[in-house]
């Protein structure tokens, strides 16, 4: 099957400028890229993608474009003539999409064709108390950090020597690897994308140009921060490669288990034990809050599980306008290790209460009635 005209493939006139060619190619490549076309549309899209790639690689090269304009496909197809050299893999693709796909996959082109990479992000786990999380705090942390080697001033080469241009990639930092129909541009395995080879590495940094040290950072923990939240420290991650920007440091907050309170969002919960005498007769008890002590009036006849709400005694979250509440859950404590005299008094009380029936123990009486109905 005869090939379509390359200008027709890209949808541009024969006098199209380089910018018009690039714009047309980018539009087609984005439309027919394999990642965007799945299922039944995958095969036709792949053919369109290859066709557009080949057309752009020929027309974006001044020498190949001139040969194509004069001789047509025969001027650029090595299978149709003695070999003027065909398309060179993804060269045109990388040129047209370097700024898009480079960012997507973490790499970009620096000057001289060297791969520029953003540094990796780092993570740090910080333990704080509930009180510190509620009020906020400033803290110092020490993290491992890569710094420029003082011996070689970051060059990686032994003092008095210098790095040489990589002979494998000719300083570009990348090599062409053919995979079936495609030629894929990959990081040079010899120089690892730096474009340079160091014949005599610096003994202090072993040719890396940087050494690992401990760095102290001031961290501000905002009031109301919750467990699992992260604080980003911009630019304090690992340094980039070949002049790339550094990554970020993410500090993950872990709130230690508290002896009294449990946090639920901006609210706090605590279990408050009271004696069965206080629960029966009522009274005032003292409970702790993050702001200090508070009093609760226990009404007469309070049952286990009763919940008392203290408004505004919780935590004001990072994005909240008002603080949460404190919920006190009552636990009626049963006395233990009774003396004989105490046992006698309780038995007398029990007999007296039984005579009152539902008057004194409505829940027990109701439960007894339901049991009788169930077994009848």
Swiss-Prot record:
Check the record and name the PROSITE patterns matching this protein: DNAJ_1, DNAJ_2, ZF_CR
List, alphabetically, the GO terms of the cellular component aspect.
Answer: cytoplasm
> Required co-factor?
Zn(2+)
Q: What S-S linkages are listed for this chain?
A: none
Whether Lipid biosynthesis counts among this entry's keywords is no
Q: Which UniProt keywords apply?
A: Chaperone, Cytoplasm, DNA replication, Metal-binding, Repeat, Stress response, Zinc, Zinc-finger
Role this protein plays: Participates actively in the response to hyperosmotic and heat shock by preventing the aggregation of stress-denatured proteins and by disaggregating proteins, also in an autonomous, DnaK-independent fashion. Unfolded proteins bind initially to DnaJ; upon interaction with the DnaJ-bound protein, DnaK hydrolyzes its bound ATP, resulting in the formation of a stable complex. GrpE releases ADP from DnaK; ATP binding to DnaK triggers the release of the substrate protein, thus completing the reaction cycle.
In the record, the note on similarity to other proteins reads: Belongs to the DnaJ family.
Q: What is this protein called?
A: Chaperone protein DnaJ
| Organism from which the protein derives | Acidovorax ebreus (strain TPSY) (Diaphorobacter sp. (strain TPSY))
Encoding gene, per UniProt annotation = dnaJ
């Amino acid at each position: 099957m005869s090939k379509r005209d390359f200008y027709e493939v890209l949808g541009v006139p024969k006098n199209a400028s380089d910018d018009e060619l690039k714009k047309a190619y980018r539009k087609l490549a984005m439309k027919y890229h394999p990642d965007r076309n799945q299922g039944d549309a995958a095969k036709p899209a792949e053919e369109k993608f290859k066709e557009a790639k080949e057309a752009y690689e020929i027309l974006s090269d001044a020498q190949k474009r001139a040969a194509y304009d004069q001789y047509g496909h025969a001027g650029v197809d090595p299978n149709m003539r003695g070999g003027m050299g065909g398309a060179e893999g993804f060269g045109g693709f990388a040129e047209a999409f370097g700024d898009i796909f480079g960012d997507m996959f973490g790499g970009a082109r620096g000057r001289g064709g060297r791969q520029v990479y953003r540094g990796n992000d780092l993570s740090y786990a910080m333990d704080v108390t509930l009180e510190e999380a509620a009020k906020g705090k400033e803290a110092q942390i020490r993290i491992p950090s890569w710094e420029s080697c003082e011996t070689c001033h970051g060059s990686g080469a032994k003092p008095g020597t210098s790095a040489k241009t990589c002979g494998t990639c000719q300083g570009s930092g990348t090599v062409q690897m053919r995979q079936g129909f495609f030629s894929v541009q990959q990081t040079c395995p010899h120089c690892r994308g730096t474009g340079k080879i160091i014949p005599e590495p610096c003994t202090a940094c072993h040719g890396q140009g940087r050494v690992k040290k401990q760095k102290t950072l001031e961290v501000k923990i905002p009031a109301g921060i919750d467990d699992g939240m992260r604080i980003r420290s911009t630019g304090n991650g690992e340094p980039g490669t070949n002049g790339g920007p550094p990554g970020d440091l993410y500090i993950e907050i872990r709130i230690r288990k508290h002896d009294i309170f449990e946090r639920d969002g901006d609210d706090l919960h605590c279990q408050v034990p009271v004696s069965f005498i206080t629960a029966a007769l009522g009274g005032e008890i003292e409970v702790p809050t993050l702001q200090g002590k508070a009093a609760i009036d226990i009404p007469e006849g309070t049952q286990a599980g009763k919940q008392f709400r203290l408004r505004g005694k919780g935590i004001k979250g990072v994005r909240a306008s008002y603080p949460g509440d404190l919920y006190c859950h009552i636990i009626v404590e049963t006395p233990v290790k009774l003396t004989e005299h105490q046992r006698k008094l309780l038995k007398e009380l029990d007999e007296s209460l039984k005579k009152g029936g539902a008057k004194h123990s409505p829940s027990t009486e109701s439960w007894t009635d339901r049991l009788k109905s169930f077994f009848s």
